[in-house]
């Protein structure tokens, strides 16, 4: 298996090196949806998310990867950022653990599924081990240096009723502005202003008769 593992590492490094050189800094969310109901219980949970971690690892919750366990935010956390994180690959540390094992610093959790042979006309199936990312929600106290992490929300405080107050002005790293409600609002407002300005300028041109007639 060591040969296949080395091949995997080579391919991952090759892809990351090429993509990073072509577009450095390309990481963040292209989609993010928070469970607003759990905020009232003092917990943070992700319903769906898609994007790239800073180390180039793609994630897709819940289609390809399980959503991280909800984080019961510590009441002492104030003006702190909660991150979506994955342990960094380190020499001498297991990359993969079996389902049910302690995750530790593993980057993949293996589970067995029945796979169909797409090239056979027969209903031929076989058990296939599939690895998913054991993503988790952490804060700075959990050690960001050992993780590829991107900020999800900034928690202002945990109120006396245990609900979470989030900083609405916080914008996480993004690949698509549609993943952020504030940025989407700014974009739509700007497009609306540009449209109004364009209509006003067009009206002035027509009113002044400054139109050119082109003939072949």
What is the predicted function of each stretch?
Residues 67-203:
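Internal, hydrophobic cores of structured domains that mediate oligomerization or house catalytic pockets
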Residues 37, 54, 64, 87:
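Acidic/polar N-terminal loop/beta-strand segments that form early-domain functional surfaces
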């Amino acid at each position: 298996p060591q040969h296949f593992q080395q091949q995997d590492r080579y391919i991952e490094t090759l892809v990351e090196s090429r993509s990073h050189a072509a577009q450095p800094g390309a990481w963040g969310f292209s989609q993010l949806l928070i469970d607003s109901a759990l905020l009232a219980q003092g917990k943070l949970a992700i319903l769906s998310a898609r994007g790239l971690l800073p180390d180039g690892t793609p994630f897709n919750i819940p289609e390809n990867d399980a959503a991280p366990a909800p984080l019961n935010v510590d009441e002492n956390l104030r003006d702190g950022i909660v991150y979506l994180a994955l342990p960094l690959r380190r020499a001498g540390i297991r990359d993969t653990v079996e389902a049910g094992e302690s995750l530790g610093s593993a980057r993949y959790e293996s589970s067995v599924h029945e796979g169909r042979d797409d090239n056979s006309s027969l209903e031929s199936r076989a058990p296939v081990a599939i690895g998913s990312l054991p993503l988790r929600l952490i804060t700075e106290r959990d050690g960001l240096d050992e993780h590829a992490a991107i900020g999800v929300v900034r928690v202002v405080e945990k109120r006396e009723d245990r609900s979470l107050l989030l900083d609405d002005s916080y914008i996480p790293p993004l690949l698509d502005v549609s993943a952020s409600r504030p940025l989407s609002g700014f974009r739509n407002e700007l497009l609306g202003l540009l449209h109004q300005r364009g209509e006003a300028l067009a009206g002035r041109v027509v009113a002044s008769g400054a139109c050119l007639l082109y003939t072949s």
